[in-house]
């Protein structure tokens, strides 16, 4: 009987050593997926907003007003840039806007997240170019002289 007294404690230590990292990894994977889905929804909303907003630049470089409104839409969920970011640590510098031009007007607008990092327990995940969404442009392009 004396030889069996420590076996339960030993089994508990081994099981804990395996289960704690397993549960931590599962939690972190779930949290990363949750954040990615929030970012995907924000990017989709920003691309939808950009596809309907008047494009006021004659080139593939959007005007500062257009860019800031679309970036605010992605980061804050509104073009004014008020409130809390949709995801902790997300800033306007993490949002890229790429109009795909057809002459003087965009044919489509691509919005994506770049350089956004999620800190995990053992490492860090950085999103570069993902999530990304492209919408066909349905707004009006302002005429330029």
What does each model-identified segment do?
Residues 1-5:
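N-terminal leader/signal peptides at the extreme start of proteins
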Residues 8-27:
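Alpha-helical hydrophobic helix detector
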Residues 26-29, 53:
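Alpha-helix C-capping/helix-to-loop hinge sites
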Residues 28, 32-36:
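Alpha-helical transmembrane segments
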Residues 37, 41, 45-145:
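Short, conserved structural patches
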């Amino acid at each position: 009987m004396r030889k069996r007294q420590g076996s339960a404690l030993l089994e508990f230590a081994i099981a804990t050593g395996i289960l704690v990292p397993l549960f931590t990894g599962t939690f972190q994977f779930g949290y990363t997926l949750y954040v990615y889905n929030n970012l995907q929804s924000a990017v989709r909303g920003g691309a939808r907003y950009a596809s309907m907003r008047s494009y006021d630049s004659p080139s593939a470089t959007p005007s500062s007003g257009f860019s800031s409104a679309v970036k605010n839409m992605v980061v804050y969920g509104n073009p004014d840039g008020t409130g809390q970011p949709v995801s902790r640590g997300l800033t306007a510098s993490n949002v890229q806007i790429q109009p795909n031009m057809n002459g003087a007007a965009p044919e489509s607008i691509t919005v994506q997240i770049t350089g956004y990092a999620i800190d995990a327990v053992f490492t860090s995940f950085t999103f570069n170019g993902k999530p990304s969404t492209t919408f066909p442009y349905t707004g009006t392009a302002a005429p330029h002289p």
